[in-house]
Amino acid sequence: TEKIYLMAAREPLALPRCSRAFSLLWNALPKVNTRGNTTAIDIKVKSKLKDKLYLYAVQVAIKEIITEIRVLKFKALVYFLNIISMKINKQTKKILLLSILYFCSLPNNLFSQDSELFANDLNLKAQLTFDFKELYKNTNDSTFIKSPMVFSGNGIDQDTITVRVRVRGNFRKKICYFKPMRLEIRKKQAENTVFENNRKLKLVVPCQNEKGKDELIYKEMLAYKFYENLSNIHLKTQPISLKIVELKNGKEIEHEMFAFLIEDDNKVAKRHDIKKFPKRRVSPLNVGDSSAINFALFSYMIGNTDWSMAYQHNTEMFYNGKKLLAIPYDFDHSGLVDAYYAKPNPMLKISSVTERVYRGLCRRDPQVFAGMRKFYISKEEDIFNTLNEFKDKLDEKEFSRVNSYIESFFSILKSDSEFKLNILSKCRG
C-alpha cells in the first residue's frame, strides 16, 4: 500500500483549459479535506506492478510537459484519453487523471507569463536600437520598423528578441524628441519569455533629451498607480530602465531613461470578461454611473482635463453587457504631472493645467455620487502610501508640491461646502 498526497487548485478559474474533464471527474473523486487555498486529497492505493509502470509513465510525461509547456493542451488531452482506456485499478486511474488535471492548471498558476510581465519588483531593463529618422518618417498606424530588444530583470536571464516599433500618440508625437511608442511582439519571439502573451504594448518615454527628463514620467506613472487604488478595472503598468541606441550617420548614440510599459486594452477586457468597445463617438450617458463618476473624480483629483468620453479621447471604453465602462489614460497634460509643454484648453477658461475643473455630467444617480465620494475618502491613506513610494524619484520641492496638490483634493472632498462649490455645482448638462 502506498499513500499519495496531491495538491490541486480549488479555484475553478485556475483550470479553464481542462474544465470539461474536471467537471466529469470531480464527483468521482474521494472526499477531500480543505486546507487554506488548496484542497488536499489523500488516496491509499493497492498498486500492482502494472499500475506502478503506468504511474511512472505518466510522471515522465508530466516532466516533459513542464519542460515543454507550449504543448500542454495537446499532450494533456492525449494522456487523458489514454488513461480512460487503461484497464487498471480504479483508484490508480483516479490518481493519474487527477495528476493530469493538476498539471493542466500549471500554465494559469505557475507559468502565467502575461501576469509575470506586470509583476512587482521585476526590475526590468531593456535596450532598443533603431534609426530615429526611419521610425519618425513612418507615422501611420500600420507601419512598423524592427528593432532588437535586449532585456533582463529579477529572475530573468538576459535575452534578445525582435520587436516591431511605431510611433503613437498625438501631441507628444509632434513636439517630442523621444516619442511615445507602440511595441508589437510576434508570438514566436515572445514564447518562453516574460513577454509571452503580451503581443501589443505601449511604451511611455520622456519627451526631450534633457536633465530631469525622467521626473515627468515618474509622475505620469504615479497617476496610473493612483487609479489602481480606485478601480479594479485599470491598465497595468511596468517600470523599465530603458536604453535607446540611436543610429545616426553611422554612429551609435546611447540614451538612458526611465520609461514604463502599459498593457494592451484587450488584456483588460480578457481579464475582466468584458468587451472592448469600438473607437467611435458615444453618448457619455451610456457609461455606467459608477464608472463615469469614478473617471471624473479621478480626473479632478489629478487635475486632468485632457479627455473626452464622447470622442473616446484618452479614454478606453469597454462594455460589460449592460453599460459602458470608461478607463482613463495619458496623463501628461494633468496638473499632477505639470509638464512644461502642457497648455490648458482655452474653452475651459483656466490659466494653468494645475487649476482643477470638474467635467463630469450632472445627470448621474445622487446616491452613487455620494457613495463614490465616501469611497474616495476611504482611499486617502492608500493614495498617500502610493505617493510616498515615489518620494525618492522626485525632487524634494516637486514632491512637496504634488503632496500638497493631492491634499487639497481631499480637503475639498471632505468639506460639504467645498464639495458643493467645486464639484457638484460645476457638473455639466
Q: What are the functions of these language-model segments?
A:
Residues E11-R17:
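Short polybasic linear motifs
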Residues L77-Q113:
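Bacterial Sec-dependent N-terminal signal peptides
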Residues T1-E11, K31-K46, V58-R70:
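Ser/Thr-rich, low-complexity intrinsically disordered segments
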Residues L6, S19, S23, L55, ...:
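Short hydrophobic targeting helices and cationic amphipathic motifs
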Residues Q113-G429:
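Phosphate/dinucleotide-binding and metal-coordinating scaffold of catalytic cores
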Residues P12, L49, L53, F74:
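Cationic, low-complexity basic patches in intrinsically disordered or flexible, solvent-exposed regions
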